[in-house]
């Protein structure tokens, strides 16, 4: 497994893709078609399919999780694409995420950072029992909310290995992302 290893692109043509399908449902249909044809299915990670675990992370047309900002791959729907579009799907290719197979990457480095306390704590100057009694400054509340929205997908880690001219990870941008990136660079 090596994040710099050359892979190869495969082309698959799909018919009968409903605009209401999620991107992962489309991948499931593709894999069913491949298995019927005796072709090995495309390996990809997924878990909750509800946008809360981050396991489904992949690059779609050069963007983390695809064309929608603040949407995970499992929340992306096929209506975002036109009938007949060619969609390029790639694994997260970063030094921290060696490719295991197809779109599956080894996330263990990121998991270790999270287990070691890779999180942002925002002081909102109160404790649980005072939560509804103490007014919180809007700036502090916004910082706390931004930190809490991180689902640990790892899109922010892709920044390190990006080529010039690529846009930053589309799904993130808050303080948690900025706090985790220095951990990767050390």
Question: Where does each model-flagged region fall?
Answer:
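Short, solvent-exposed loop/turn segments that connect beta-strands within catalytic domains
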Residues: 3-6, 64-68, 82-83
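A common structural microfeature
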Residues: 11, 20-23, 45, 53-55
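Local cysteine-cluster metal-coordination motifs and their immediate loop/turn environment
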Residues: 42-79, 145-165, 186
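Ferredoxin-type iron-sulfur electron-transfer modules in oxidoreductases and energy-metabolism complexes
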Residues: 21-40, 87-186
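Eukaryote-biased recognition of intrinsically disordered, low-complexity regulatory segments
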Residues: 1-16
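A surface-exposed, charged beta-strand/loop segment in the N-terminal or early-internal portion
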Residues: 69-95
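Extracytoplasmic/periplasmic beta-strand context in beta-sandwich domains
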Residues: 10-12, 72, 87, 173
């Amino acid at each position: 497994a090596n994040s710099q290893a050359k892979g190869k692109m495969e082309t698959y043509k799909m018919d009968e893709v409903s605009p209401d399908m999620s991107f992962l449902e489309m991948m499931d249909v593709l894999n069913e078609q491949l298995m019927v044809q005796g072709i090995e299915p495309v390996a990809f990670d997924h878990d909750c399919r509800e946008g809360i675990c981050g396991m489904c992370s992949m690059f779609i047309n050069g963007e983390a999780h695809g064309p929608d900002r603040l949407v995970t791959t499992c929340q992306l729907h096929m209506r975002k694409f036109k009938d007949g579009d060619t969609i390029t799907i790639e694994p997260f290719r970063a030094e921290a995420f060696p490719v295991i197979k197809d779109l599956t990457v080894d996330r263990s480095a990121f998991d270790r950072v999270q287990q070691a306390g890779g999180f942002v704590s925002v002081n909102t100057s109160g404790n649980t029992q005072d939560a509804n009694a103490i007014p919180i400054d809007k700036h502090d509340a916004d910082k706390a909310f931004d930190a809490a929205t991180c689902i640990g997908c790892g899109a922010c880690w892709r920044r390190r290995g990006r080529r010039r001219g690529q846009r930053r990870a589309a799904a993130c941008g808050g303080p948690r992302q900025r706090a985790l990136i220095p951990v990767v660079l050390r």
